[in-house]
């Protein structure tokens, strides 16, 4: 199963490179045609190479550690409730079930700091293009696989799960572009570039919104949906201003562990690991809901 997942990703690499080149050309053509282009952030060389370096690191980690999450899921499969066959309807069922697992993984990766430490690098770019999609985490294999535990316990075969996880990852690639606008009725059900631009925004109104993988219906169902309105300011609430892939990958781990080490109480130490990003022991910190709340109050004033 692990080998099959890697094969799917490897086969997609030429497509990634070709579409990145096409997007770069289209953005450059737009800039040359319009003179000064201010509405799109576009590319910078250093940022794009940092994202590509993160993608290469992700592949290395996947090669080295691929068996860990798969072994865990395979172990859980022996306790399955049902024997789900590999037929057309089970693929449709898995499409929705896996996407729901992804939604909660992604949402909690924004709401629990130790999970955010693994995910933050994907949001660290102040640009939004197809290279941003490749700015993947090097540490998620240690923190993420447990969210897919319900699938083998229900009885989905491991190889089906791994293939569907790969399909979800590949679907999300095209979401990372400024070139595609809103998609009307399609966007009522499916995740789109417009929805995902919101997710990458550091605007207070956009923080921790639109966690969907394939289906945006989960955000609408669980109250985390926000349509694209004001211009998106990409990046983190506190940007890190570095193109060093190792700093991008591990800066939040270092910050989190430093905060926990310096905490005055065990409750504080636990809080710095498991509360929302922005939480502080003295209560002075601002989490995403607090920043959003303050913004809405200010807007209404």
Question: Language-model segments: what does each one mean?
Answer:
Residues 18-29, 62, 66:
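Alpha-helical transmembrane segments of multi-pass membrane proteins
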Residues 23, 52, 218:
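Residue-level signal for inorganic ion chemistry
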Residues 232-301:
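Cytosolic-facing loops and C-terminal tails of multi-pass membrane proteins
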Residues 73-83:
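Membrane-interface helix termini and inter-helical loops of multi-pass transporters
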Residues 22-49:
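Membrane-interface helix-loop junction between the first two transmembrane segments
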Residues 56-65, 84-235:
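Membrane-embedded catalytic scaffold of the fatty acid hydroxylase/desaturase
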Residues 1-5:
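Short, Lys/Arg-enriched N-terminal segments with co-localized hydrophobic residues
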Residues 6-16:
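Hydrophobic transmembrane alpha-helical segments in integral membrane proteins
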